[in-house]
């Protein structure tokens, strides 16, 4: 029993250290170009438009996660629920745009599933980078976007994009 308890404690500590190292690494390697570069072209270029929906989905999803895990808000907090809804709406929209505008196909279950497989890894990668940046901000001055003008602008643009698309 004692060995099982020691093993459990070591496993939890290693997992936490891995998670912290991963977050630090994500914060260091934040290399996303400003969202404004894509916003300018999004009305006339479908690739720029899908990039906006993927990036916005990722930013809003990672913001919800950061509010919960870094700021300690409960998962049923209205702010988190709103961000999660916008994240999922934009994520689903990315899949549909990918099928209809990028591939030029009529939406059905099969090509929707293929789109999820192609698009979701990008969203996950963006979420990792955004969360890393949010985590770095939180470590530096206990804020998420309050002192980060780029994330403020991108969050504002993403909420506006969601409002226009719904």
Named regions from a protein language model:
Residues 3-13:
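Sec-dependent N-terminal signal peptides
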Residues 13-19:
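Sec/Tat signal peptide C-region and signal peptidase I cleavage site
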Residues 42-106:
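Short N-proximal segments of mature Sec-exported proteins
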Residues 90-166:
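Compact alpha-helical subdomains of small soluble proteins
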